[in-house]
Amino acid sequence: MEFSVKSGSPEKQRSACIVVGVYEPRRLSGIAEQLDKISEGYISNLLRRGDLEGKPGQMLLLHHVPNVLSERVLLVGCGKERELDERQYKQIITKTINTLNDTGSMEAVCFLTELHVKGRDTYWKVREAVESTQNSLYSFDALKTRKGETRRPLRKLVFNVPTRRELTVGERAIEHGMAVSTGTQLCRDVANMPPNICNPAYLASQARQIAENHENLTVTTVGEEQMAKLGMNSYLAVGRGSHNESVMTVMEYKGAVDSTEKPIVLVGKGLTFDSGGISLKPGEAMDEMKYDMGGAAGVIGTMLALCELKLPINVVGILAGCENMPSSNAYRPGDILTTMSGQTVEVLNTDAEGRLVLCDVLTYVERFDPELVVDTATLTGACVIALGKHASGLFSSHNPLAHELLNAGEQSGDRAWRMPLWDEYQEHLESPFADMTNLGGRPAGAITAACFLSRFAKKYNWAHLDVAGTAWNSGANKGSTGRPVPLLTQFLINRAGVEQGE
């Protein structure tokens, strides 16, 4: 899809289709009023006859409107003018794109970016339109012998902005939106791959492909032999039952003017399949445990977006690839593991494995002398119970970092909600035989998991994103969502000090 911005009046547009908004009840937006005036009341007459009420998502396609140069005019219901919010705006854009494809239009000029959305500027509206469009066009059929027959003739979409001085803002919004969309698509593609293809080595190969096309990015891997030398016994224990070797992929992006500038480190849990190990999961929906590498998919997608944007910062992305399988060689409940940090962990349940991988990675990243560390993981079902599918769980021992991430989530529409990380919860991890257990019991499961990780992240500013509820959808729309790529990319854009709005 090709995107561009322009600033012009609707009567001068010669495109295949013009897209304008209509409010409820039957109220023309400013641009629609201009078209109505040009057409001598043609549009308002249709509305008076009840052809369109203006409810959110309603569509009415008009052909050969009098005195209008464009072949078609698409009227889009936008609801009540003062109630148009971010969620409705995204839904309207998605419905518009689907309708345009149904009409057979190859190009369109969209004036919906001129609508008033509460608390949002032109930059946000254009960027969100790009991301919503790309998201609506996504499909994963790489492994189907018969590809989908979906009709998608739309090739070019032009967003109109109110004034010429906003053209630069619009162009920047398209650039950022395309980068986020590219990263989100890679995240979804990698996460949707089946576990017989997407194993830890596959994650590494995907990272190398990005590095081949971006000179600022280098990729190295740490295999099991090197992990053993480093003392990453907790990480190794989790993968011991699998035929697929555990591989930690290290992606180093150097974009700062000063190459010695401290990097931001992103860590992604990469359990390419999680059977639960000896503490075997129930069979129902176990196929979805291929998504237990959603954190790593989010990091690799964010690293691609970062490379596309060429942000002037240094970032290290870690893909903690591993597979948790039952076998005679698998680790067991009751085992006590000595982590890379030297702390010991009593294993109460082998299905609480993500934290055992991440704890060693959080120790490993100390060598980068990081500015800060953010880990992202599909860590706990408890977070899904607490927050559902709308917000990722955010935990942090550093208030400024937590606020930055929350703000990035609000800006990008990929929201998070901060959870407590109080000392009282640490008591749930006490063990009579080791420094701690790997499970805090059923109460506050997402919090105690984050408390566990916090014990290995004391030498830098750290935050943890639990994306177990947001990384993928179940049911009829099963598949990766691409989150938290928008949040993490926005966080990096903000950190880089890149100009965004007006």
UniProtKB/Swiss-Prot annotation:
* Reactions this protein catalyses: Release of an N-terminal amino acid, Xaa-|-Yaa-, in which Xaa is preferably Leu, but may be other amino acids including Pro although not Arg or Lys, and Yaa may be Pro. Amino acid amides and methyl esters are also readily hydrolyzed, but rates on arylamides are exceedingly low; Release of an N-terminal amino acid, preferentially leucine, but not glutamic or aspartic acids
**Record-level GO BP terms:** proteolysis
Q: How is the cofactor bound?
A: Binds 2 manganese ions per subunit.
Where is Mn(2+) 2 bound in this sequence? Answer: 269, 274, 292, 353
Q: What does the record give as cofactor?
A: Mn(2+)
Location comes to:
Cytoplasm
Q: Which GO terms describe its molecular function?
A: manganese ion binding; metalloaminopeptidase activity
- Tell me which UniProt keywords the record has, alphabetically: Aminopeptidase, Cytoplasm, Hydrolase, Manganese, Metal-binding, Protease
Q: If you read the UniProt record, what top EC class would you report for this enzyme, in one word?
A: hydrolase
Catalytic residues at 281, 355
| Residues involved in Mn(2+) 1 binding | 274, 351, 353
SUPFAM superfamilies the UniProt entry points to: Macro domain-like, Zn-dependent exopeptidases
Please name the CDD domains in this protein's record. Peptidase_M17
| Superkingdom, natural source | Bacteria
Extract one GO cellular component term from the record: cytoplasm
Name the Enzyme Commission number(s) assigned to this protein: 3.4.11.1, 3.4.11.10
Give the signal sequence positions. Answer: none
User: Member of which family?
Assistant: Belongs to the peptidase M17 family.
Instruction: Quote the function comment for this protein.
Output: Presumably involved in the processing and regular turnover of intracellular proteins. Catalyzes the removal of unsubstituted N-terminal amino acids from various peptides.
| Protein's recorded name | Probable cytosol aminopeptidase
Q: Source species, please?
A: Shewanella loihica (strain ATCC BAA-1088 / PV-4)
**What gene is behind this protein?**
pepA
